[in-house]
A protein has these predicted regions:
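Active-site metal-binding core of divalent-cation-utilizing nuclease and nuclease-like domains
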Residues: 133-137, 448-472
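Metal-dependent nuclease catalytic cores in nucleic-acid-processing enzymes
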Residues: 183-190, 343-351, 440-448, 492-512
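Conserved catalytic cores of phosphodiester-cleaving nucleases, focusing on short active-site segments
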Residues: 442, 465-482, 496
Length: 533
């Protein structure tokens, strides 16, 4: 089987024998039930392939669709004038790059359809091209814009400056927003010349929207009819890749059901509508099946720089961000607010819908899967704590240590990690800041160990346990103190009976008291005790 990893050209996939998951019934429905759409999906989720498929369809390339659902659905294969604008691969942090990109695009189209001498701005010139294309072919124009938001995301919160035509200094971010708003405004005036428009991207901007200049597109990002338009459903995975899953199961020496469970925990969990259809991350699952290994493929391709910049302003506890219900207005429309980056985190694919409350039309948001949870928390921890070295190797060592039940080594690993955090990050003068740093630091560190079941501040009959980590062979029950003693922490675990619920559990139970010094910013006291309950 040939896996289309990194291939976004529909024609190449079909001509060269790569596997293609048939989405053309959804494409047919999309085309015949509206004409101006917007779709938001995370990076590497198949948006560019969708654009390429639509381009081939509207160009009437029927031979590429042989054997697919749309071959039977479409009775007329017409060749529409297609205008494909792709913002991928461009660096828009350079002043003038956006104008240059749009200028080149419009000039190329004018070579085909002619230039209207009365049109001066890029928007007016593009509108004239659309009109000429309609008149020349007798068919409405098709406009496909891939990653429409990249010119904004590249410069968002960078503080980069440029100069306007009058020599006034201004933010490059504002300049790009103005250019795009003017360019897209042509769609409203050119409505009669348009057959179909689709804009894809990661983020839907609000208030400062580039969409305000033209007919509001139909946002299908949370439309359950098109939830499977990008990504791989569980049904598609099991029907198309059954043999590959069996091969992975053999390699890992587990049953087929166990292998499906591991793939699901690692790469599944995306939901884009109230229907809660399970969608697998296509980039990760295809890489995993191809290489027959479970690894963090999507996260390794890099974290979006715009998100890293926004998180530098983020002052919320991640524990309070996840596992909560939100109205759609809180996470769908991004308002360029660095103090409330929830929409950016959600739309970038680091949070997803886990439940829908029909009565309040609100959504429970949480991490989609283990790959994303581990990667995102590690990214936030590195940004917040700024340790001297990347936490990745440290996390692997901690996971292996906890699998072995080595509490002494675990103490050394945790202590050394805290010691690696620069003093400037650890030093807190205000008591409230000391407490927040203490709590949030332990939360981030524990959350990075996502291979296991981690329970933070779990309520029990006798009180609230700071942290419980469950591994296949061991259960670790932690109580943390700040400027106290490990003995005091251990005593609390025993007196409150935090281990009581594991009375019938065959695993070894470890009770761990840990004291954190706000003076040094590190662990200065640790006591552990194995317990048979």
């Amino acid at each position: 089987m040939k896996y289309p990893i990194g291939i976004q050209d529909f024609g190449k996939i079909r001509n060269d024998g790569y596997v293609y998951l048939d989405k053309t019934d959804l494409i047919y429905d999309l085309v015949h039930n509206g004409n101006i759409y917007f779709l938001s999906r995370p990076r590497r989720f198949g948006k560019s392939l969708l654009i390429s498929t639509l381009e081939c369809y509207f160009q009437g390339k029927k031979e590429l669709f042989k054997g697919l659902a749309i071959e039977q659905l479409e009775k007329e294969w017409k060749q529409y004038p297609v205008f494909h604008i792709d913002f991928n691969g461009k660096n828009f942090t350079q002043a003038g790059e956006l104008e240059k990109t749009l200028q080149t695009f419009v000039e190329t189209q004018e070579l085909i359809y002619g230039r209207n001498p009365l049109a001066n701005t890029l928007g007016d010139r593009f509108m004239a091209v659309l009109k000429a294309a309609h008149e020349k072919t007798g068919l409405g124009a098709v406009v496909l814009i891939d990653e429409y938001d990249k010119p904004l995301l590249d410069v968002l919160d960078t503080g980069l400056k440029t100069f306007d035509s009058e020599g006034n200094e201004r933010l490059l971010e504002d300049r790009h927003r103005e250019i795009m708003k003017g360019f897209y405004s042509v769609f409203k005036a050119a409505d009669r010349d348009l057959k179909f428009v689709l804009l894809t991207g990661v983020t839907k901007f609000s208030q400062v929207s580039v969409f305000s200049g033209f007919n509001q597109p139909d946002d299908i990002s949370m439309d359950d009819r098109y939830e499977a338009l990008c990504g791989i459903t569980e049904e598609e995975l099991y029907s198309v890749f059954d043999e590959q899953i069996k091969a992975m199961a053999a390699r890992y020496k587990v049953s087929e059901d166990e292998m499906k469970y591991r793939l699901k925990r690692k790469y599944d969990g995306y939901h884009f509508s109230p229907s809660m259809l399970d969608i697998y991350n296509p980039f990760s699952i295809l890489n995993s099946l191809s290489k027959k290994i479970l690894s963090d493929f999507w996260f390794r391709t890099g974290s979006p720089t715009y998100l890293v910049r926004l998180l530098a302003h983020f002052d919320e506890n991640l524990n309070e961000l996840t596992g909560k219900f939100y109205p759609t207005s809180s996470f769908i429309d991004y308002k360029a607010d660095t103090e409330a980056p929830l929409p950016m985190i959600y739309q970038s694919g680091y949070l997803t819908i886990k439940e829908w409350n029909m009565d309040t039309d609100s959504y429970l948001l949480d991490f989609p899967n283990d790959e994303v949870k581990a990667g995102f928390v590690t990214m936030v921890a590195a940004n917040y704590l700024k340790p001297k070295e990347s936490p990745d190797a440290w996390v692997v060592e901690v996971v292996n240590t906890m699998k072995m039940g080595d509490c002494d080594k675990l103490e050394k690993l945790l202590t050394s990690f805290f010691a690696s955090i620069p003093y400037s990050q650890r030093r807190k003068d205000d008591e409230r800041e000391k407490e927040r740093y203490f709590q949030y630091t332990f939360y981030l560190v524990i959350r990075m160990i996502s291979s296991f079941t981690v329970l933070i501040e779990k309520e029990q009959s006798e009180g609230r346990v700071d942290c419980i980590i469950e591994t296949p062979m061991f259960v670790y029950i932690f109580e943390f103190k700040r400027d106290g003693s490990a003995t005091e922490a251990l005593k609390q675990i025993e007196e409150k009976g935090y281990a009581r619920e594991y009375a019938t559990d065959n695993r070894t139970i470890y009770l761990i008291g840990c004291n954190f010094s706000s003076k040094t910013g590190t662990i200065d006291d640790w006591k552990s005790k194995g317990k048979s309950v």
